[in-house]
Amino acid sequence: MAHLKLDTLHVQRSPRGSRRSSPSSGRSSACSSGSISPVPIIPIISISHDGDESESESEIETEPVRLFQRRMSTKCTNNLAAIIKEGFLLKHTWSFQRWRRRYFRLKRNMLFYAKDEKCDVFDDIDLSDLCYFECGIKNVNHSFQIITPTRSLVLCAESRREMEDWLGGLKTATAPQRPRGDSFLIEQHDILSNHHHWYATSHARPTYCNVCRDALSGVTSHGLSCEVCKCKVHKRCAAKSIANCKWTTLASVGKDIIEQADGSIIMPHQWMEGNLPVSSMCAVCKKTCGSVLRLQDWRCLWCRATVHVACRPQMAVACPIGPAKLSVVPPTSVHSISTDDAWDVASPKGNFSPLLVFVNSKSGDNQGVKFLRRFKQLLNPAQVFDLISTGPSLGLRLFRHFEMFRILVCSGDGSVGWVLSEIDRFNMHKQCQVAVMPLGTGNDLARVLGWGSSCDDDTHLPQILERYESASTKMLDRWSIMVFEKAIPVPKTPKMSISTEQEAMLTGMVTSANHHLRFIVETNDTQTLISSTRNLCDTVDDLVCRISEHHKEDEQLAVKCDILRQKLNMLLDALQEEEIGAHSGDDLIATIRSLITRSIPVTPGSNAYLLNPNISIEKTEKDQINTKERRNSRSLRSSEKEALQCRANSVKRAIYNVVEHSEPGRPKRYQRKLSITPFEALKLPTTASGESTPCTSPLPIIPPINIISPTMETSRLTCISPLPDTRRDSVDENFFNSINLPAPRQFADSRRSSGVPEVIQEIEEGANGETVYRRSRMSLTGGANIDDAGNRLSPCSDGGENTPTERKVDFLRVPIHTGEPIVDPLCDYRPHEVFERTYYMTREMDKDKEKDKEKEKEKTAEIEEENDKCVEKLGSIPAEKLVHTCNLQVPGVVVTPNPQNVYSSASITIIDTDAQTTTEQSSSDDLGGEASDVLSAISNEECSVASEIFDKQDAGQTVGDIIQNMDASNFTHIDSPETSDETEAMPGESLMDDISSVLGHDITYALQDNTLTDDTTTLCSEHAGPPKPPRKKSLSALSRTQAHPRRRNSSPPRTARLARMDSDDNPQQFGFENIVFEIDNRCDDQKMREPPRYCSLAQFVEGNDIARQSFKQLMLEQHRGGDNDIESPEQQQAPTNKGAHLLATTSEDELSTQTAIKIEIHDIDATVRSINSSMKPNTILTTSTSPTKKSGHGQDISVVVRPPTPLRGDSIKPTVSLLPVSSGGAMAVSMTCSGMLGVRAMNASEIRRHSSHAPSLAVREFDKDKDRRHSGFNPNQLTLDPEHARFLSSSPAASRRISCGSLFKKKNKKIATKRSYGLFSVRFFVVAEPDFRLATLALIRPLIPLPNEALPNLQTLKGSKSSLFMGSTLFGFDHLASAERDKEERGGKDKDKTPTEEANRKLPIINPLVRLPNWPNLANGGGFISKCLLANADTLCAAVSPLMDPDETLLAGYHEKCVMNNYFGIGIDAKISLDFHNKREEHPEKCRSRARNYMWYGVLGSKQLLQKTCKNLEQRVQLECDGQRIPLPELQGIVILNIPSFMGGTNFWGSSTKKDDIFLPPSFDDRVLEVVAVFGSVQMAASRLINLQHHRIAQCQSVQINILGDEEIPIQVDGEAWLQPPGMIRILHKNRVQMLCRNRSLELSLKSWHEKQRQHSISIQRDASSTASEHANSTDEVISERECYVLLNFIEAVSSLVKWVKFLIISHPALQHDLYEVACRASEALESIHPQGKLLEGPSLRTKLVEVIDSSRQLYDDACTLLRDRGHSLILREDLETKLSAALANMEMELKKCSVQKCIDGKLRAYFNVLAPNEESDGRRKSRPFWVRLRSGSTAGQQVFKPPLTNTREAANNWSVNEVVTWLETMQLSEYVDSFLKNDIRGKELLTLGRRDLKDLGVVKVGHVKRILQAIKDLSEN
């Protein structure tokens, strides 16, 4: 029934069916479809008959079969089947060539379409026999055509991407069903199926269909062409074509496989019939083949050989593959696809370097489509991939099994980065080499690699492939862009809300306030400033009033509104300060003052009773001092501008805080970007269940600032900069809102930090329901509880009411023990930022201030009395105990043991200055009243070296213990928690990075910084501390704490002291890191009851990383055991001079006026022996070699040591005398002296570890005229507050463990002993005026080799740039380096630097312009201790082996955003790129040409010139190069270059015309980045024309950029731009990839070699074949007429030569007679070819002529030799000489026409060239142009020497036709040889050929004509 219906349908046709040919025509080849009927199987489909819906084609073709059937509903079918793709497309209609929008739905083997997606009736098309193709090369309208046996649809998509999606969907719909239906198998099926890939095209000549063999219709022969094999078909015949496209794998070769006897497979030819190129020549018969009349002859798809049908059997079986043989993957080599989706490859014989090609079809205005098709025609289609459709992964997976292959990326830089990222993913760096073909616009990488800026023509692609085959390899550095972004969460529960109208009004107010703030910061107009300021105040007042009306009961909101008023008041103050100098007394000042008066807050006054009366929000004296300092700044205007910017940001943030609190559901830009609020960080449990304390007040419970909550997101627990040894003096206040970072330098003051020990009031609910207020102090140091009066409490105090849980709360708070009532220590110096934070904690404190002062006085008097008693007790020590000790006059200085954070040995002492243990106190935390000192103790303290020297050490250790530790053989190292049996798991960090980073840090700017920071503790101590004292206020503890010199502070002195607990249970003694660990790991009561376990020490086993045998240090037992031990540190004090005034307290005012203290050390060994006489013998191991021997030279070293001071150190000049002495007990005396002084002395070398964030110490000679702040010294400078320690806790730069044992060897002891004479005899003079540099010298003196010391590394010390003492004005070693420099300058002034010297330059290399006054002053360089380490790196690093990868944990919290190959930009350049990207996405048709894109870039750059959207970028970002902060001028962008090409070919770094002594030459394979400043769009434009260099910033190996504020900043990487939110960006080296660079020298060499080989082969072929045109039509035996003419001339020449040679011999009998015999032999041979006067005929003549030619050539050679040898003595007649010369010349010409060849039968035959003899050369020369003659200096009257005319033109002018033919064949134009031979074209005619002449010769191809004319031009010019 179905067949009957089909036949019936076949009869029903359209009225236009008459135009249709017979349905069976052309279907004979389609019988393989399986159809029984001769007619096609046509399914029942429904087609619309609307007049405007009828289909049409672009050519006149027969109408497909039309079916008139009732349309049925397809709703059920559509709902059942799975939809592959659906959407709207434009359908081309027949009427008026219109497009109609239709909805298409694609399913398996079916396509449905209707007017709308909701229609129930869809037209359906069967896709079982489908053909689809694109409708154009460029595909401007993104159209494609679908052809089935019954339908033909032309569809158009909105974009090329959508069109390719539809084509891919059609491919999927028609692909056979497979078990694994992923995209890989679909793409694999497409590669291996050998199906044609059609596209519509036109042809310039008659073309014939390969299916029906008929001509394509139309004048232009419009039809379909396969983009791979160039098969031509009609559109109606496309579905009938067989799948015989170009082979891809061995399976596709099929029956054509040829296998040899040995089993190897030969690559056969793959023939395609007809449509041959013009002038195709048969490879067998060398005749023209192909036709324009019919489909005939064959061409190979691989080697491009063409043959006749008759000559094809004679063709060689094996295919040579063609000119690109080296790059082609033969299909016979690809056997199958293995299980890992890669080819199983059998490498072919010979050279083989497969080429994997990736083409971006969208690049270059879709020019990539042409290249994609061209590559598929030249190579194996399976090795060419479209990046748009398949991406790089498919090709890389298939090529995975190739040992080595090349990759060619035809696209821009973005696609190159895509491919390189996929190579990273597959880890294929070692097996592939990447080349780039420039398509599109972004081709900076291709330009640098030598491949040019564009490649638009695909006609020379074979030659281009040869260039890539001869390319060389270079390594390209690739850089990871690591990003850490700030979290932007949404509040969980909304607090309040306002109506929609009020919300709109609120938004408008905030926008208006921001607008006015921007005007205030940026404008320079006074009137605008006044109006903006007044409007801002009005807007803020209106905002506060409206919000307060709707939220009257919200007390916190009222506080925030008051804070907003305070911030506005501070902004007005800053405005007044800025303008008071230039506008004193004008309207602006008056306006601002009136606004200040009006803006005074109201709420704080009403709630003043809630606040601590000590807390003040008024401007303090220090603020005025800072203001005065800013006035004296050399960068006054920029500093004031920055201050104003900070104040404006503060006001802006306060506005956002108010809005956020009133409306938590606002947009994200109004929300503070905090992952968790500070108040939610930690809930202190007060009940057994661990729940938070009930609180009736809105005040939340504040956690201790030193404790990291386990609820804090770990993604934020990272340091601001993990880079080592980094200095940060200026961080914008809104960088991280939850972290108080250092303010800019103008506002950086230790009194302004929020990280202070704050007084909080804990509100608890008592047992009877009453409210209990408990006040506590939070601190980083301390472990005991205190009562309301500040007294120390025992664990069971508080009336016994405290439960264990409450004690746990007290433990978590870790309050400090104070000797005074609780008051705010920063009462007079707290700024408004701190006021905001401390408001909630202190608002209900109402202690009486006068009462606190009285208690303070009482406690001070009591302390002084106890100290006097201690001093008297010390004075009673027997003198026998200290017989030979030093004469000591020190107030309250004790002999302290090796502290817990000191690890010492015979060669090195490591001091952890970050460790804040119970036995170590910072330099000022005992001064409770000193605001700056207390803050420094809690945050990052900045102190001088002298304060470090005299730091107090609690519960000390004896000198013997120190010496024991020095000489102990069991050196240990800090065991990581994961390897220790006594510790719990810690976050995986180690101190190794600290030391390793310090050792690797460059100190090019050595000794330029002068501050050392004690940062948050991270190094855990191994010392368990002294025995537990009774839990009461200990006078001895107080005295130990206070009887200790401290650094003086400029603020008013306070006598209150803050002591620390010395309990064993105090977790602080084990370091802050362990507290963090314990808090994070104790979440229930059971864990809280467990005893804490801390990091122990483990033995270092050589050859291993960390030993597993952990144990405590031996000094514990030595310290505790024995009655002979020294009883207390007080008893270790030295006898004092009776005349000296000993102070019982350490009041700094008294210390500053104290008299000098003289310390004399005469006998070191005796001193050590007497000091340690009471200790156990086995604990003393001295280094003395001669105990009773005095110093060898008898000289002393006198050092004047001044106590530290925050004042400038240049007020009193130091007097230092260094007298070298030598003794064996150097180290002993060094440690003894330092121990008695409480000094942490260095034993030959000392490591003082400090945080990577800390500003560190360096020695610098300050200028008197400079302010201390501009010299980099500010004792109140801040770095990071303790809250930021949460980041440091997970930072490997702050907490890494180092294997100390790996640093020390036994040989180091000997070296240290030899070099440790620096403190043999030392006199310390402590005078009233302090200077910290001399104390520094006293410490590092053992490190300094004296000039007369014979050390092997002395030259290294003098020559190294990173030497500690070079360039220092303190140590006086500059003369060594200066002498060397002078010597080098005299010796090698004109010598260039060697590559080794360039390689030895230390990075980062920073532009000296950074030091100029117009750049901001920012202290750079590493710390003092790190520079000491670098100076002695040879000793320290002798046995160091890295314990881990330093980058493993450096990037905690970071993620890789992308990878940089070319350049990175932030600011204006990224903004321009982002705008261009948006423009291109919006209007792609406007950005399709390279010239238009350049215009768009110019327009967008000019727009930025006016708008300046990236103005003041230096205020929004911070730049660090290799860990060093770089000060930034006013700029709009920063560019980081990896290649010397930027945004379209600009050499933005600038080329150096001379040898650059500062920077290294830029290169993309040196692991170095170039950092450049962008000042504006004008500079970017000028850099294309001018070689700019002043904008260079630095060269470095890593870069970090901190984005401040809350706004996004445009960023671009390799031209791809986006908006980056605030956070941190790190650029680190990722890997290197092999890139192919163009090698022009190799190309020229190969070209010349190929030409020689070609000419040689052509000459051989020419000798083996006849050169005359007649030879092709006649046999070799017959002499032609022209040859006969040449033969007669030859006979005449031979006869003449024989005649005159014989006459010469006869005339001169003395000559050789053998020449006469040769002449006779030649005469006889000549007679033999014409016996009896008749020439021989037939083949014998050519055989006889061989003998004649040989004899005549011998006669010619012998005659020439004779005349050359005897010509000077031979006297000839004039006529004989002339005739003999003419005969020889004629003979030479005739011999050139002769050739002897060996024939097939083995006989030699002679042949003659029938061409005319060479004519005389044209001696005329074209006159040179006038300017050439003028430059050469020749004039008309001068005789100019003319060289011999042997140039190419003269040689070509003498060419014969044979040589012209050879010249044609070298240019691969052998098809014109016959034409040149027939027309007798010689060299002279060749040089005059024109375009018309070439056309007459048959050269009709335009390309051939141009090539010949260009070659002729080259011959003429050369």
Curated annotation (Swiss-Prot):
SMART domains: C1 (SM00109), DAGKa (SM00045), DAGKc (SM00046), PH (SM00233), SAM (SM00454). Residues 1855-1918 form the SAM domain. It catalyses: a 1,2-diacyl-sn-glycerol + ATP = a 1,2-diacyl-sn-glycero-3-phosphate + ADP + H(+). GO terms for biological process: glycerolipid metabolic process; phospholipase C-activating G protein-coupled receptor signaling pathway. It is found in: Cytoplasm. Its EC number is 2.7.1.107. SUPFAM superfamilies: Cysteine-rich domain (SSF57889), NAD kinase/diacylglycerol kinase-like (SSF111331), PH domain-like (SSF50729), SAM/Pointed domain (SSF47769). Residues 20-37 have a biased composition (Low complexity). Belongs to the eukaryotic diacylglycerol kinase family. Phosphorylates diacylglycerol (DAG) to generate phosphatidic acid (PA). This is Diacylglycerol kinase eta. It comes from Drosophila erecta. The lineage of its organism: Eukaryota, Metazoa, Ecdysozoa, Arthropoda, Hexapoda.
